[in-house]
Amino acid sequence: MLNFGLQPSPTGLEFSHYRILAEQDPNLALAGLRMEVETMLKNLSKGFNVSLEERDSAGIITRKLKEKGAITSQQTELVSAVIQLCNAAIHGTKVLSYQAQEILDIAEILRDEYVSWLSWGFQDN
């Protein structure tokens, strides 16, 4: 993965760490999850040759991936839902454990689709 210039996942794509953390500190768990999701988005961008600016937000990266056809409308909606709650948590909105767990459920779907993409290799553009 690193041979292709992809960034490693902070947890090796193992989200159980965030589930455990969400029981004690849901906001911190979602802050970590936000970094995971952004890493996945940037790696997808690299694999699909989507041009990014250094300061592109996760939302902008998601839009660019959708425009390129790299992700579906449903994936776009799921990513947006995850990022929205993660950002709220980072900016001080109190998140309850069950809310964090629900977002982790969605994030695991996205992670599984990302892992499938990794197993296919990069699209030739």
Could you say what each language-model-derived stretch is?
Residues E77-N125:
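Charge-enriched, short contiguous segments at helix-coil
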Residues S9, A31, M35, S73-I83:
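Alpha-helix N-cap/helix-start motif at coil-to-helix transitions, marked by capping-box chemistry
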Residues S45-Q75:
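Short, charged amphipathic alpha-helical segments flanked by flexible coils
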Residues A31, M35, T39, I60, ...:
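Amphipathic alpha-helical interaction segments
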Residues N3, P8-S16, Q74-E77, S116-N125:
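Polyanionic, low-complexity intrinsically disordered segments
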Residues T39-G47, E67-I71, L85-A88, G92, ...:
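Amphipathic alpha-helical interaction surfaces
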Residues D25-R55:
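Hydrophobic alpha-helical packing segments in soluble, helical-rich domains
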Residues M1-L33:
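Membrane-proximal, non-transmembrane interface segments of integral membrane proteins
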